[in-house]
């Protein structure tokens, strides 16, 4: 996430910019290893009016009596940080990866999440068989996730072909890869 891009920006600025452009103004950036330059960049870059409820705050890994170790991955980072997130009212929690380049309309994803009555939504991107072992791959049935496998071996991929639409199938993109973008209903987290 601290990787410089285009001179003065960092990779983490992409998901933060996506949030700000979607009207999402309350964000936590969870950091752990070798994060001093990233923490400094966030602190020096994102300033909001004193009258605004908007913020971009760093939640660095911390050792507590309940969690004496470092984060053991993204899910654990979120789990250990929930006590900092809980006081902020919201019906939904958007969880993003800080190291991807994309532009996304989160409002559209949230609308789909609500329309399906989902508890959790995962943004996916169709990928080709040669790319699939680099991602978490999921199967779905009418918009509902039925199975998930993290970085599958090529030998099992034939069982993970999904309906990705005619255009993607024609391009050889038969697998749904997780983009590391999730919406959770708040009541699942607390």
Model-predicted segments: where are they?
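Unchanged
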Residues: 1-190
